[in-house]
């Protein structure tokens, strides 16, 4: 009976990895939509998010069924409770990609981003997408050290976001308040996508070790 139970836990972990992969694909397409004013890519991100939402409902149902099925021991409880948190993080990652796609669609056929911030956004997107891919990988291999590296790699996103804000508040900014606010909001979406990927890594550490590290502790793994 426990063998079957553990098999279902393994299947649950696989579904989490699939959700994370879908969120990463959504962010890649949202970035393409944003940087290239690609309305087709934007529409696909918005349309495909329904699949992530449906998966969240199904995977949550599976997780709670595993809680009710037997009396899970400590390690199994960690897996299930971590899974519930990771489900929320990955769904939110997909939702952030949708926000980017919707802004792109609203402004189409115009380019959303002023020229002086386009390179910054391209770099932010690279970091966000790479962190999403790494989050998916740590869900598969459950390596606490690799999971902890997500936190360190997020520093690049923080630096890029600070640079973006410095451009927006500079007296040389000539695109007005509305564009400035919209650009800041888009930057925040990329930053939050990366934050959720880091949180997936933190939950994997807890799943494996039984310790949920603080921001200061995570680099010790």
From Swiss-Prot:
Gene3D superfamilies named in the record: Phosphate transport system protein phou homolog 2, domain 2
Highest taxon above the source species: Bacteria
GO molecular function annotations of the record: protein homodimerization activity
Disulfide bonds: none
Predominant subcellular localization, coarse grouping: cytoplasm
Keyword flag Transport: yes
Keywords: Cytoplasm, Phosphate transport, Transport
Gene Ontology CC entries for this record: cytosol; plasma membrane
Function recorded in the entry: Plays a role in the regulation of phosphate uptake. In this role, it may bind, possibly as a chaperone, to PhoR, PhoP or a PhoR-PhoP complex to promote dephosphorylation of phospho-PhoP, or inhibit formation of the PhoR-PhoP transitory complex.
Listed NCBIfam families: phoU_full
Subunit structure: Homodimer.
Protein name, as recorded: Phosphate-specific transport system accessory protein PhoU homolog 1
Gene: phoU1
């Amino acid at each position: 009976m426990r063998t079957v139970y553990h098999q279902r836990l393994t299947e649950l972990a696989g579904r989490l990895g699939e959700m994370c992969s879908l969120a990463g694909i959504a962010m890649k397409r949202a970035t393409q939509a944003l940087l290239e004013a690609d309305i087709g890519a934007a529409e696909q991100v918005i349309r495909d998010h329904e699949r992530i939402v449906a998966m969240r409902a199904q995977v949550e149902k599976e997780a709670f069924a595993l809680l009710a099925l037997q009396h899970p021991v400590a390690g199994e409880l960690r897996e299930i409770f971590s899974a519930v948190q990771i489900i929320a993080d990955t769904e939110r990652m997909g939702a952030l990609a949708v926000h980017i796609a919707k802004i792109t669609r609203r402004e189409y056929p115009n380019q959303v981003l002023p020229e002086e911030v386009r390179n910054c956004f391209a770099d932010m997107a690279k970091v966000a997408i790479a962190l999403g891919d790494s989050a998916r990988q740590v869900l598969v291999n459950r390596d606490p050290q690799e999971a902890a590296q997500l936190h360190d790699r997020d520093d690049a996103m923080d630096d890029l976001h600070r640079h973006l804000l410095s451009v927006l508040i500079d007296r040389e900014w000539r695109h007005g308040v509305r564009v400035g606010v919209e650009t800041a909001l888009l930057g925040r979406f990329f930053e939050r996508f990366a934050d959720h990927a880091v949180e997936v890594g933190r939950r994997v550490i807890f799943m494996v070790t039984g310790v949920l590290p603080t921001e200061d502790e995570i680099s010790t793994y």
